[in-house]
Amino acid sequence: MSGPAASDLESRAKAAQQLAHAPYSKFRVGASVRASGRTFDGANIENASYSLAICAERTAMSAAVLAGARDLEEVAVCTDASPPSSPCGACRQFLYEFAPDPAKVRVTAINGAGERRSWTLAELLPDGFSGRELAVSEPE
């Protein structure tokens, strides 16, 4: 990511991190995705029944899908970790589902200290599995 749009995506991920509900792990995550030219935010939301927690990347992409924005373009993730944490495996797979070309989707991880790491979604999930392998197309 580069330029003002990237800065906006990263700023939104930082703001979303402040809204995380992480009373158990204390690991707050914020995410912002650009899909179909629009931006959507999410934060991790934990639950006392740990398996019911949902990650920031999935809350952001779910908001995009609900708004009809399904073509993933970029992702920014903000954590307090050093170095910044990449998305977990479940989030990588979830995001891959909505990437028209995973090699062109930039995923940037940042933290409050200004550290930054960046990959393509294809680098994070090589040989990923999607509806393309199932020869499934979404209804028009």
Where is each model-derived feature located?
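Alpha-helix C-terminal capping segments
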Residues: 63-68
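C-terminal binding/interaction regions
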Residues: 2-22, 69-140
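Short acidic-glycine loop/turn motifs at beta-strand connectors
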Residues: 35-38, 111-113
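Short amphipathic alpha-helical face segments that pack within enzyme cores
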Residues: 55, 59, 90-93
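Stable alpha-helical structural segments in soluble proteins, enriched in small hydrophobic residues
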Residues: 13-16, 56, 60
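Compact, glycine-rich, soluble single-domain proteins
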Residues: 44-58
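Short beta-strand scaffold segments in enzyme catalytic cores
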Residues: 26-36
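Glycine/charged-rich beta-loop-alpha catalytic/anionic-binding loops adjacent to active sites
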Residues: 37-47, 71-75
